[in-house]
């Protein structure tokens, strides 16, 4: 796997810093942990922003950090990211907050240190847009939303 240097600042001065950890040597995403003063109960249908206590500095504009749900929390408890995927731009310096929604039927309790999401670093390309009279033809054309079938 490729690696990049990511500078981290811990924004909570009242707690000992804890660097993010990869769960296994082959993990693509690094776990983000909740940084809480007390337990947080997320009711069904409720959206909350969970602080991580971390701020990062990406090495250059060609890299972005993307926050994804943890598969176990989503499949077992219905805890998903409220915005689908969190995008951390290379020039953002604030605390990483994870916006989650409880799509389950039961309240979900988050404790300090719980692994609540995962962050993946990916290359980012800046689009250089230009206006065209028409787009090139393809076999698919304008077909979308299930136009290619399910089997």
From Swiss-Prot:
Keywords associated with the record: Hydrolase, Magnesium, Metal-binding, Nucleotide metabolism
Source superkingdom: Bacteria
Catalytic activity as recorded in UniProt: dUTP + H2O = dUMP + diphosphate + H(+)
InterPro entries: dUTPase, dUTPase-like, dUTPase-like_sf, dUTPase_trimeric
Binding, substrate: 70-72, 83, 87-89
Disulfide bonds: none
EC number in record: 3.6.1.23
GO terms of molecular function: dUTP diphosphatase activity; magnesium ion binding
Protein family according to the UniProt entry: Belongs to the dUTPase family.
NCBIfam families named among the record's database cross-references: dut, PRK00601.1
Function: This enzyme is involved in nucleotide metabolism: it produces dUMP, the immediate precursor of thymidine nucleotides and it decreases the intracellular concentration of dUTP so that uracil cannot be incorporated into DNA.
HAMAP family for the chain: dUTPase_bact
Protein name: Deoxyuridine 5'-triphosphate nucleotidohydrolase
């Amino acid at each position: 796997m490729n690696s990049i240097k990511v500078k981290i600042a811990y924004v909570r001065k009242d707690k000992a810093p804890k660097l993010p950890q990869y769960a296994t040597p082959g993990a693509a995403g690094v776990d983000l942990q909740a940084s809480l003063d007390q337990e947080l109960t997320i009711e069904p249908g409720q959206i909350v922003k969970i602080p991580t206590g971390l701020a990062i500095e990406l090495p250059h504009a060609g890299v972005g950090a993307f926050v994804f749900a943890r598969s176990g929390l989503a499949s077992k408890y219905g805890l998903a990211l409220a915005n689908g995927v969190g995008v951390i731009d290379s020039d953002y310096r604030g605390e990483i907050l994870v916006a989650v929604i409880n799509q389950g039927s039961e309240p979900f309790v988050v404790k300090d240190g719980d692994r609540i999401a995962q962050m993946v670093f990916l290359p980012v390309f800046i689009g250089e847009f230009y206006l065209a009279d028409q787009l090139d033809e393809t076999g698919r054309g304008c077909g979308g939303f299930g136009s290619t079938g399910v089997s």
